Swiss-Prot record:
Protein name, per record: Putative ATP-dependent RNA helicase SoYb
Record key words, sorted: ATP-binding, Cytoplasm, Helicase, Hydrolase, Nucleotide-binding, Repeat
GO CC field: cytosol; Yb body
Compositional bias of kind Basic and acidic residues: 297-313
Superkingdom assignment: Eukaryota
Biological role stated in the UniProt entry: Involved in primary piRNA biogenesis in germline cells.
Length: 1476
């Protein structure tokens, strides 16, 4: 289909993939029209090749695949080719629609070779005669604006003018809307996003296609307009083309003629005539067109009302006939829907009509199609993998493809095809008859079928779990097979609960049969739904079957007790139970959550009886300890512990106590459901011995192997020694015939290891011979060869030569031992095969060592000596977000760090988290009485008396509306830790930060602006956050009351305490919330106190109304618990001590500096430096010229080591300096600059006191030119005396304000002169929020660019050219650029926090080395005030002083004792804690 485009001809195109104006993929509309019919026909055939048997675990690049496109409704099957792989995702190019798709391996199948022929000719294109406005890279705004125009256009035309080296067509692209037609190049130029380029040669780099620019294969995302356009066009064109089919090729025509001229009569049964619509059979001809069967249907189905029902029955009957099976094995028909008018239903059969053909035109055979008057069959609500075939009972056509025609031809002529045997076809795809029958049965299933019980789950589904019980367990395939009741079934239907998990199909029928269950599986695997439907169904059955026994009917207590680990899970599971029973009307309490009511209310509810009691260990212990009979053992049916391991880690003693009380009331004899993450052999066996009909269900095969007595052996050695170690392990087996499996990481490692083992005399087999493996042969497998499971399940020795990418895959490897795991109920202990595994670790996967050791320790397995590198490796991991947010993390497979480091403490430059800082904030949310989310508004540092507003770039109350309106909704991809994105939360867009991105579909994010809680969302729900919102600081801050815990058991907070805090802080509009920071860690502020203040404006003071810490202790809601923050307190005290030592030694460190020019000279001793510092003399008044080097008493220390230590100390000193500047930023801003005479004197002093002889000589010559020759003798002494006087005057001291040279060169790196270029004169002025530059220009034309922190200005038209480069201190953006004559005014606005803005440009170094850059001292002073204004201000000050005895500075300086009011409680803590 290669077509050379005419450079002089415009053609209508469709753009399917747009990267930038110079790179997009397009296809001609005529090509889409010509190939639409074949594309649809191939897509209908793809469904036969998408069975579960044909799936693969890994696909390689350039492999042709079948893709399930989820974003189409319903999902459709398309063809694609793999371009790249990244972890579990694949980047696939869709062949027939021309775009990249990011999809998972579960949406891919191999594409057969005979269906891989390319049909559409997609080309690479670009807009000619255009270039980016600046540079060679297109800006994001240019790409988005043109992309939007192209998507909204009604028609696109393209005229090729040049072909690039990479076969990319550059031409004139025009888009036509309803009102006008515009050229793409002109559009970019008008938008100031492109510039005209006259040359046709486009040396534009080809941007690599990445996952970020690909479409995401998720049904929750709508199809983009450009993709929807081509998809709908293919469907429409194929339907319009059904009236005529293409003429077969010459070879196929000969085969058809030979078939039709055959004298053998090809008998077709009547049933096939009905399904294939064969009109008649004669000795010499056979019609394959559709015929009207309305007469036949009218004879067989006289009642029109039952037509649809009978049609379904007949179709199923015909599909099950033996004659049809025999016929379909030879003739395979593919059908698709036809659309005709109703008038054609009464027309008779028509003959085939063909038109004349020639070699250069498309030849089509016209065919009249008919539509019967019968009603259409109702389709199933969800039919997987059959979306592309729209089956209608009365609208079918028969199309013979090339392969099908060849098969008929070979059958009729008695030929035996060599390469297309029936066995090969059956091995490549499922039987068409069986699959068609199955699909029709699924379509006919519109209600709950009673025959579902006859179907058995697939073998692979059984192998996904390990189920052990005294009696065989019969799993189900659907919840509809269970007697759950209509209420539960309807609720499950509302949830669209279609495919149950393997653990659920075993747990449901066992619980229905009154059995007990121990389920071992990780969290997030649907464990709760393995028992919830059955529990709720049993509760509703008890409500319906009211007993006649009065004692049982009025018995108190619940029918089921559900014990969870946290308040959050209690709320979640209670809502699940309420949803399942929502349609059942009863006066009884169906669900009671003890954490949603006060304990007194809970007691009353239990006395009146209820259905399901959802509680925690602490509350259940109180209920069972109560004197009232709140739980009746005769009424109780279920006891569920979810999750056992989390309860054990939280409070093992309380868990043991609750088990004893439950056992004392006979609760363990009831139906027990115990959900855990780990197998605890001793404890669980005792529980199972007391239960009836126990079932142990494992979804985690690693835990199942430990249940079977697996012996762990873990080693950590160099990768070079692993092969030798493996040979030693195999030699230690003493010839015992153990079936051995060795896992490798990839194919290359497998081949290398196989060669080593064969060379050592061992026999190796691959995965293809897994079923016939003998014990003396080693089977080698790599992860890429394995799909979900291997066909072997009798391995005795499992060796992990390398670890997989995730812990989930590592756990799945142990399924190969499933058949050798002995059943605890049927086989005596001591029998069976020993299971052994070896994990060979090296430096490549050493980071998993701590996790494996922790896993072994949690299971009570002995571990040998651990390497010293464990702590170091563990410190590289990020801190666990769940532990930081909730205070604990009970996830068994958590791979995050659970201990704090010094690096977790806040930087000194962040005053909000410094000890002693007072913060006035706005209350957002209370998660518990000691954990809240607030929005800081003002703060005052510990040693300051000034309140400073928190500098938010955007007003907080309007930020949420700005984010919700006018922001493009694009899915954020890929998801990385700490990425900022949007999520739809409470009907508004909210900023969130990704804190955990596990291998599961859900991503853990944390709110940033109006809360700090963690949310579990799907990756498709994360939206792209524009850059203007991405860099804004977080509005919400997490605060915790340090050293305080709930008064309940295990430190839990009571419901009353939570309710009291919410009521107290819900409406504090007239009060101010003030917190006192104790210390901070990882953006969480641990506070000493949370106070509510009421201001008294008339008295110029304020009153403390509530101290939260004292109120919680006074009312008995809380207790002192300092153990929870001992680790944090110790790290903070150590860090505080280091900072104090740095402050004490600051002067010594500064005075220990040496000259930069004499870096290689001998370093003086530490004693000499201290003496120099104590005498008050400085070697160099300009610290910019001198680097900081710490003198070490160790003479063997190298210069590089000293330099490293000096840099480390200097960074800490700089942080201290920045902190002082941030606290007193207003004083720094108001400091008046030095006058010119003082600057000149300081410069001369610096030059004369330097160690460089050349500088001294040049300075003396300069002074000689100013003063007389006879006065030069005393100049040096006079300047020295001036030095002492300047040091005594604190107002003109310059040294401490100047930055060190290293920092100055880093912050202000002015461009050096290059050839004949010069600097323009620039005036600099800065405020707290802005920087203003005034540039003297020689020409009105200039170029100004801002890249990050670098500002570049250049004028190339002048001779010599002008330019300068400024590397600014912080990130800025250009606010305005104005031209006033030959002066260019540039205004820059700071981005981010405003208290990191030190002033550097009034230093001597700038005036000396950047002579072209001067500080605008006149503007910093401002115009002098008028005399009248001065008098008026003096009068107001005098009047104010006379009226009030105290000044305004003492407004908040009073202690709580100074304004005690009757009936108000105050905290008995240090008074300076609340001092403002």
């Amino acid at each position: 289909m290669e077509h050379q485009l005419d450079p002089d001809q415009e053609e209508s195109i469709l753009i399917t993939h747009f990267v930038n104006p110079h790179q997009f993929s397009y296809v001609r509309c005529i090509d889409v029209e010509n190939s639409a019919m074949l594309v649809r026909q191939i897509e209908q055939d793809l469904k036969d090749y998408c069975s579960s048997e044909r799936t693969k675990q890994v696909y390689v690049e350039d492999e042709r695949v079948i893709v399930r496109y989820q974003r189409w409704s319903p999902p459709k099957l398309v063809r694609g080719v793999v371009r790249r792989r990244q972890n579990e995702e694949y980047l696939v190019w869709i062949l027939d629609y021309g775009f990249n798709l990011c999809c998972s391996v579960w949406d891919l199948w191999p594409l057969p070779d005979h269906l891989s022929r390319s049909l559409c000719d997609f080309k690479e294109g670009g807009v000619a005669l255009i270039a980016p406005h600046s540079g060679s890279v297109w800006s994001r705004s240019a790409i988005e604006s043109l992309d939007k125009q192209l998507e909204d256009a009604n028609q696109l035309t393209f005229q090729v003018v040049h072909r690039g080296k990479s076969n990319r067509n550059f031409g004139l692209l025009k888009f036509r809307s309803s009102c006008q037609t515009e050229d793409a190049a002109n559009f970019l130029i008008k938008q100031d996003q492109g510039r005209c380029k006259e040359t046709l040669t486009m040396a534009i780099p080809y941007e690599d296609i990445s996952f970020e620019k690909a479409e995401i294969n998720d049904m929750a995302i709508d199809t983009r307009p450009r993709l929807r356009r081509i998809l709908e066009l293919v469907v429409l064109l194929s339907e319009n083309a059904k009236e005529s089919t293409p003429t077969p090729s010459a070879i196929q025509q000969k085969k058809l003629d030979a078939l039709l001229q055959s004298h053998e009569t090809y008998l077709i049964p009547n049933s096939v005539k009905l399904l294939s619509k064969v009109q008649s059979i004669s000795e010499s001809s056979m019609q394959t067109a559709l015929a009207n069967r309305s007469k036949q249907i009218s004879k067989e189905l006289p009642h029109k009302a039952n037509q649809s029902e009978d049609n379904r029955k007949k179709e199923v009957k015909y599909l099950e006939s033996e004659n049809l099976s025999e016929c379909l094995s030879k003739v395979k028909l593919s059908s698709y829907q036809q659309k005709n008018t109703d008038s054609s239903t009464l027309s008779g059969p028509r003959n085939l009509a063909s038109s004349s053909t020639n070699s250069n035109s498309n030849v089509r055979k016209s065919m009249t199609l008919f539509k019967s008057s019968g009603a259409h069959l109702t389709t199933s609500l969800s039919v997987p993998l059959t979306e592309n075939c729209t089956n209608q009972s009365n609208n079918r056509t028969v199309v013979f493809s090339m392969d099908k025609m060849e098969q008929i031809f070979n059958d009729m002529l008695g030929k035996n095809p060599s390469e297309r045997s029936v066995q090969k076809n059956r091995s490549q795809m499922p039987n068409s008859n069986v699959s068609t029958t199955k699909r029709c049965v699924e379509k006919m299933h519109v209600c709950r079928s009673e025959n579902m019980g006859d179907r058995k789950p697939s073998v692979c589904l059984k192998h996904l779990v390990l189920a052990h019980s005294p009696e065989p367990v019969n799993p189900v395939t659907s919840y509809k097979e269970l007697p759950l009741g209509n209420t539960i079934l309807n609720a499950m239907d509302d949830l669209n609960f279609q495919t149950p998990l393997p653990t659920q199909i075993y747990a449901w029928p066992h619980l229905v049969n009154r059995g007990s269950l121990v389920l071992v599986n990780p969290s997030g695997t649907g464990r709760s739904w393995s028992y919830l439907p059955v529990i709720c169904s049993s509760v509703l059955s008890s409500f319906e079957n009211v007993t006649s026994n009065l004692d049982t009917r009025i018995a108190p207590g619940p029918l089921a007790i559900l014990i969870v680990d946290s308040v959050e899970n209690a709320k979640k599971l209670a809502s699940h139970c309420e949803f399942l029973m929502k349609d059942f009307n009863t006066q009884n309490l169906k669900v009671v959550n003890t954490h949603a009511h006060s304990m007194m209310d809970v007691y009353m509810m239990l006395l009146n009886s209820c259905g399901v009691l959802v509680t925690t260990l602490a509350h259940l212990n109180n209920i069972l300890s109560n004197e009232l009979p709140l739980v009746n053992p005769t009424r109780l049916e279920f006891i569920i512990f979810d999750d056992y391991d989390r309860k054990r880690l939280d409070n093992a003693e309380l868990l043991k106590e609750v088990f004893q009380k439950v056992n004392s009331i006979g609760g363990l004899s009831k139906q027990l459901v115990l959900v855990a993450q780990q197998w605890h052999s001793e404890r669980f066996q005792k529980l199972l011995n007391r239960t009836t009909k126990p079932l142990i269900l494992f979804g985690d095969f690693l835990e199942a192997a430990l249940y079977g007595g697996l012996k762990f052996n873990v080693t950590l050695r160099s990768s070079a020694l692993k092969a030798r170690q493996l040979l030693d392990i195999l030699a230690e087996q003493d010839g015992s015939k153990k079936r051995t499996l060795i896992y490798c990481k990839n194919q290359m490692e497998l081949e290398e290891l196989s060669a080593i083992l064969i060379e050592a005399g061992l026999q190796c087999v691959d995965i293809s011979k897994a079923q016939n493996q003998s014990p003396n042969r080693l089977m080698l497998v790599d992860d890429s060869q394995v799909r979900k499971q291997l066909p072997v399940r009798n391995i005795q020795l499992l060796i992990h030569f390398s670890l997989p990418e995730s812990w989930l895959r590592f756990s799945r490897r142990f399924h190969t031992m499933a058949d050798n795991i002995r059943n605890l109920f049927t086989k005596p202990i001591g029998r069976g095969q020993d299971l052994i595994t070896y994990i060979l670790m090296d430096e490549n996967n050493a980071k998993e060592w701590p996790r494996i050791m922790k896993f072994l320790q949690d299971h009570g397995l002995t571990t040998q000596s651990m390497p010293d590198s464990e702590q170091q490796l563990d410190n590289t991991l990020p801190y666990c977000p769940y532990k930081l947010s909730n205070g604990n993390c009970n996830r068994n497979q958590c791979n995050k760090r659970h201990h704090f480091l010094k690096t977790d403490l806040p930087k000194i430059g962040n005053p909000l988290l410094q000890p002693g800082t007072l913060i006035r904030c706005k209350f957002l949310k209370a998660y518990d009485p000691a954990h809240m989310a607030v929005m800081p508004m003002k703060y005052k540092s510990k040693d300051s008396t000034i309140w400073i507003d928190v500098p938010y770039p955007s007003y907080p109350s309007t930020l949420v509306f700005k984010m919700s309106f006018g922001v493009p909704r694009k899915v954020h991809n890929p998801c990385k830790i700490n990425d900022v994105c949007f999520v739809q939360h409470k009907e508004l867009l909210s900023r969130v930060r990704i804190v955990d991105n596990p291998a599961r579909p859900q991503v853990t994010v944390q709110l940033m602006d109006y809360g700090t809680e963690l949310l579990q969302v799907k990756a498709s729900q994360l939206l792209e956050c524009p850059e203007q919102f991405r860099d804004l600081q977080q509005l919400a801050m997490d605060i915790r009351l340090s050293g305080l815990a709930g008064s309940g058991q295990g430190g839990m907070w009571s419901t009353d305490s939570i309710q009291w805090v919410q009521d107290r802080f819900a409406d504090i509009n007239e009060e101010i919330m003030q917190i006192t920071v104790d210390f901070g860690v990882l953006d969480v502020a641990y506070v000493k106190e949370i106070a509510l203040i009421e201001e008294c404006p008339t008295m110029l003071t304020s009153v403390y109304k509530t101290f939260l810490r004292k109120e919680l202790l006074r009312q008995g809601f809380a207790k002192i618990d300092s153990t929870s923050i001992l680790e944090l307190r110790a790290i903070h005290e150590q860090w505080k001590q280091e900072m104090e030592e740095l402050r004490a030694n600051k002067e010594n460190i500064v005075c220990s500096s040496t000259d930069l020019d004499n870096r290689d000279s001998k370093i003086t001793s530490l004693q000499n430096k201290q003496a120099t510092c104590s005498s008050g003399k400085e070697e160099d008044l300009n610290p910019v010229e001198t680097p900081l080097i710490i003198a070490s008493p160790n003479s063997n220390e190298t210069l590089e080591e000293r330099k490293h230590v000096s840099d480390k100390v200097q960074n800490k000193i700089d942080e201290l300096n920045d902190f002082n500047k941030s606290v007193e930023i207003e004083h720094v801003q108001d400091a008046s600059p030095l006058d010119s005479s003082t600057a000149l004197i300081n410069t001369l002093i610096h030059e004369l006191n330097t160690k460089s002889p050349t500088k001294k000589k040049n300075t003396q010559e300069f002074i000689k030119n100013i003063v007389h020759e006879d006065e030069t003798q005393s100049i040096h002494h006079e300047i020295s005396s001036s030095t002492n006087s300047l040091k005594q005057d604190k107002t003109i001291v310059v040294g401490p304000q100047d930055p060190p040279k290293e920092l100055f060169l880093q912050y202000l790196n002015c461009a050096t002169k290059s050839r004949e270029s010069v600097y323009p004169m620039v005036k600099w002025h800065q405020t707290l929020t802005h920087i203003e530059l005034v540039v003297e220009q020689q020409m009105l034309e200039y170029k100004l660019g801002l890249d990050g922190n670098t500002l570049e200005y250049k004028v190339n038209e002048t001779t010599p050219p002008q330019r300068f480069i400024l590397n600014l201190l912080g990130e800025v953006r250009i606010d305005s650029v104005k031209q006033h004559g030959y002066y260019l005014h540039i205004k820059l606005t700071k981005v981010g926090l405003l208290f990191h803005w030190p002033t550097l440009l009034n230093s001597l170094y700038v005036q000396k080395h950047a002579h072209w850059l001067i500080y605008d001292s006149e503007r910093s002073h401002g115009p002098p005030p008028s005399f009248g204004l001065v008098l008026w201000e003096g009068y107001l000050t005098h009047k104010k002083t006379k009226s009030y005895s105290d000044s305004e500075s003492s407004e908040f300086s009073s202690t709580p004792e100074d304004f005690i009011e009757p009936g108000v409680e105050y905290c008995e803590m240090d008074s300076n804690l609340y001092e403002d």
